[in-house]
Amino acid sequence: MRVGVLSFQGGVVEHLEHIEKLNGKPVKVRSLEDLQKIDRLIIPGGESTTIGKFLKQSNMLQPLREKIYGGMPVWGTCAGMILLARKIENSEVNYINAIDITVRRNAYGSQVDSFNTKALIEEISLNEMPLVFIRAPYITRIGETVKALCTIDKNIVAAKSNNVLVTSFHPELADNLEFHEYFMKL
């Protein structure tokens, strides 16, 4: 299975390493040609506006939408979640519009407010998983087709709808492969 990681910014190397440890074939996705070679895609963290501009300028936005709408599994972590959301609070911009959620950017504050915690995410694991939040967004609304997978302090931080998975946190920065394993079976 060829698992792509949008390789513009964010935890690219860490995602690639997790995929490799699970015997997937990691692919750095930097172009439309790379996008055509993959079976599924991870959109990592970083700065959502910058990544969105990269997708538009590289003419990847519409082909990416078409692949996702056609059923290709996709997982957005942090900024990736913002890019996949239908709506971003206090913004008229949306990018991929692949999951019926509304997100709040930097909902947990600035870089100094970043934190680590643990949570049980029953759909993923029978054990608590480490969660790393860095200037993290969270979900303020989910549509009827969306299932909340995890909440922290009453805020939704992981959700799924069909072939689309989103997390506010960064599983690639934890020493745990369970989230990546779950995505690779999606």
From Swiss-Prot:
In Swiss-Prot or TrEMBL terms, this protein is called Pyridoxal 5'-phosphate synthase subunit PdxT
Q: Which organism is it from?
A: Clostridium acetobutylicum (strain ATCC 824 / DSM 792 / JCM 1419 / IAM 19013 / LMG 5710 / NBRC 13948 / NRRL B-527 / VKM B-1787 / 2291 / W)
Provide the assembly information.
In the presence of PdxS, forms a dodecamer of heterodimers. Only shows activity in the heterodimer.
Which EC number(s) does UniProt give?
A: 4.3.3.6, 3.5.1.2
Which pathway, metabolic or otherwise, does it act in?
A: Cofactor biosynthesis; pyridoxal 5'-phosphate biosynthesis
The UniProt transmembrane annotation reads: none
Entry keyword set = Glutamine amidotransferase, Hydrolase, Lyase, Pyridoxal phosphate
Q: Spell out the InterPro entries in the cross-references.
A: Class_I_gatase-like, PdxT/SNO, PdxT/SNO_CS
- Spell out the molecular function terms from Gene Ontology: glutaminase activity; pyridoxal 5'-phosphate synthase (glutamine hydrolysing) activity
Could you tell me which PROSITE patterns the record lists for this protein?
PDXT_SNO_1 (PS01236), PDXT_SNO_2 (PS51130)
The entry sums up its family as follows: Belongs to the glutaminase PdxT/SNO family.
Keyword Lyase carried by entry: yes
Note whether Transport occurs among the keywords.
no
Residues engaged in binding L-glutamine: G46, E47, S48, R105, I134, R135
